[in-house]
Amino acid sequence: GLWSKIKETGKEAAKAAGKAALNKIAEAV
């Protein structure tokens, strides 16, 4: 249903945010 869609979207967003954070850390090093 709608709730599982929201949860999936949140998971994808969290993954993307995590990757972006790792990239920023890698650039800073």
Curated annotation (Swiss-Prot):
Keywords: Amidation, Amphibian defense peptide, Antibiotic, Antimicrobial, Cytolysis, Hemolysis, Secreted. The modification Valine amide is found at V29. Expressed by the skin glands. It is found in: Secreted. GO terms for biological process: defense response to bacterium; killing of cells of another organism. It comes from the Eukaryota. InterPro entries: Dermaseptin_dom. Pfam families: DD_K. One of its GO terms (cellular component) is extracellular region. Its main location: secreted. Antimicrobial peptide, active against the Gram-positive bacterium S.aureus, the Gram-negative bacteria E.coli and P.aeruginosa, and the yeasts C.albicans and P.brasiliensis. Has hemolytic activity (40% hemolysis at 128 ug/ml). Belongs to the frog skin active peptide (FSAP) family. Dermaseptin subfamily. This is Dermaseptin-1. It comes from Phyllomedusa tarsius (Brownbelly leaf frog).
